[in-house]
Amino acid sequence: MSAVTPCADGLILRLYIQPKASRDSIVGLHGDEVKVAITAPPVDGQANSHLVKFLGKQFRVAKSQVVIEKGELGRHKQVKIIHPQQIPPEIAALTD
């Protein structure tokens, strides 16, 4: 499975998360996953909620349309974006 997989109602992203980074950003490819740096610490679900909010802004969707399918407690996550309104250029480059 690749880092970005189109599905019937959106995109499935395989992510590697770097918490406590200096800024929020989509870094690029990290092995067979997309590396995402977020500023939130990995404590009490703060990193997950921050990740959902960040991805919602990047894809221009509501937070409820960003679903963490796998990896709730780890750095390696599988996230589904339902009906993205826009694709960030870092992700668009990986779908070609």
From Swiss-Prot:
GO terms for cellular component: cytoplasm. Pfam families: DUF167. InterPro entries: DUF167 (IPR003746), YggU-like_sf (IPR036591). Gene3D superfamilies: YggU-like. PANTHER family: UPF0235 PROTEIN C15ORF40. NCBIfam families: DUF167 family protein (TIGR00251), PRK05090.1 (NF003466). Belongs to the UPF0235 family. This is UPF0235 protein CKO_04329. It comes from Citrobacter koseri (strain ATCC BAA-895 / CDC 4225-83 / SGSC4696).
